[in-house]
Amino acid sequence: MKRTYQPSRVKRNRKFGFRARMKTKGGRLILARRRAKGRMKLTVSDEKKKY
């Protein structure tokens, strides 16, 4: 049986990246909450790895 997690950096960034979060009102609220909490990394795109 195939495992459910098949990592892809492109898909991950498209779904959970900074620009994806900025697109929707809800995503911007997530960023605001994470900023208020003082998170070092706001989104997965902040992990800054090469492709």
From Swiss-Prot:
> A Gene Ontology CC term for this entry?
ribosome
Look up keyword Ribonucleoprotein and say if it applies.
yes
Alphabetized Pfam families for the sequence = Ribosomal_L34
- Does the keyword field hold Repressor? no
What keywords are annotated for this sequence in UniProt? Ribonucleoprotein, Ribosomal protein
Q: Which GO terms describe its molecular function?
A: structural constituent of ribosome
Q: Which NCBIfam families match?
A: rpmH_bact (TIGR01030)
- What PANTHER family is this protein classified in? LARGE RIBOSOMAL SUBUNIT PROTEIN BL34M, MITOCHONDRIAL RIBOSOMAL PROTEIN 34 FAMILY MEMBER
Entry's family note: Belongs to the bacterial ribosomal protein bL34 family.
What protein name is recorded for this chain? Large ribosomal subunit protein bL34
Source taxonomy: Bacteria, Pseudomonadati, Spirochaetota, Spirochaetia, Spirochaetales
Gene designation per UniProt: rpmH
